[in-house]
Each structure stands twice: as structure tokens, then as C-alpha cells.
A protein has these predicted regions:
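A feature for the membrane-embedded catalytic helix bundles of lipid/isoprenoid biosynthetic enzymes
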Residues: 34-149
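Hydrophobic residues within alpha-helical transmembrane segments
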Residues: 3-6, 28-32, 60, 88
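Juxtamembrane helix-capping/reentrant segments at transmembrane boundaries
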Residues: 11, 15, 19-33, 79-85
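Alpha-helical membrane segments and adjacent membrane-interface helices in multi-pass membrane proteins
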Residues: 1-13
Length: 149
């Protein structure tokens, strides 16, 4: 995940500096970003720490947020980055939370009677991605809708 974040930050910058940026490069960049999102979050969703339903809800939220950004560009409103938990933010969270989960695991069940909730840091991250990314996608949609008049 860390390597993905570093490479994602560098690829566009290198293309601009070398003056070789192109629409095809932008297409490849966005496509590979979504593939990376699906692989990373799919691994988390299919892992043992997160309920698969919550994991896939996070994937849907992430993909909808990214889609709204690129769809704005497609309809002529310009690329839209508004809202919380954009790609850079998510990559930071995806580096920090698994690290905290690994080194600072806390049994959340001790705070809930009868242990009905089997929560951990990864589960909380996926809930946050599902909810915040979906709300940010709606925010982007509304902003784009307003701009299009």
C-alpha cells in the first residue's frame, strides 16, 4: 500500500516535469488506481478481520467517490476532488490503520456486553470508508449537478 501511494504521487508529477503527460496517460493512471483500490480493499474484505459485507460496502463507496470525480470531467465540469477521503487520504489511512491493527490490536468486545460486536481497527476503517466515501460521492454529485446548471 505504501509503495502504491508513493508511485501514485510520482507518476503524474514525472509526466508533467518531462512534459509527456497525455489523455492516454490519464486514462491509464485512473484505471490502474481503480484496479489498485479493488485489489487492496478486496484483500481486506476477503480477509479474516473484516466482515465481507462491510468490506464490499467500503469498496462500493470508494469506487463511487472516484467515479464521481472522473464523471465530472467526462461531462465537461472538470475533474472534481471535493469531499472527504479522496485517494491520497485513503492511502494514508490504508498505511496507518493496518499498522495500528497489527501493533496495537485492541479487543473491542471488552467494551460491549456479551461481545455482540466483533470490531477492530480494520472494521472501523471499512465502516468509515463505506459511509464517508458514499456521502462524499453524493456531495460531489450535487456539486457537479449545480455546476452544470
Amino acid at each position: 500500500v505504501f509503495l502504491t501511494a508513493v508511485l501514485d504521487a510520482l507518476d503524474g508529477m514525472v509526466a508533467r516535469i518531462r512534459e509527456i503527460s497525455s489523455r492516454r496517460g490519464d486514462l491509464i493512471d485512473h484505471t490502474l488506481d481503480r484496479v489498485a483500490d479493488i485489489i487492496i480493499m478486496g484483500g481486506i474484505a476477503l480477509g479474516s478481520l473484516v466482515d465481507i459485507t462491510v468490506g464490499f460496502a467500503a469498496i462500493i463507496g470508494i469506487l463511487m467517490l472516484s467515479y464521481m470525480g472522473t464523471q465530472a470531467q467526462a461531462v465537461g465540469a472538470g475533474r472534481e476532488y471535493a469531499g472527504l477521503l479522496g485517494r491520497a487520504d485513503r492511502l494514508v489511512v490504508l498505511v496507518l490503520v493496518p499498522t495500528i491493527q497489527h501493533f496495537g490490536y485492541q479487543d473491542w468486545n471488552q467494551y460491549f456486553s456479551e461481545g455482540y460486536l466483533d470490531w477492530n481497527y480494520m472494521t472501523l476503517m471499512c465502516y468509515a470508508f463505506a459511509i464517508v466515501c458514499t456521502l462524499s460521492a453524493f456531495y460531489r454529485f450535487n456539486k457537479i449537478w449545480t455546476e452544470l446548471g
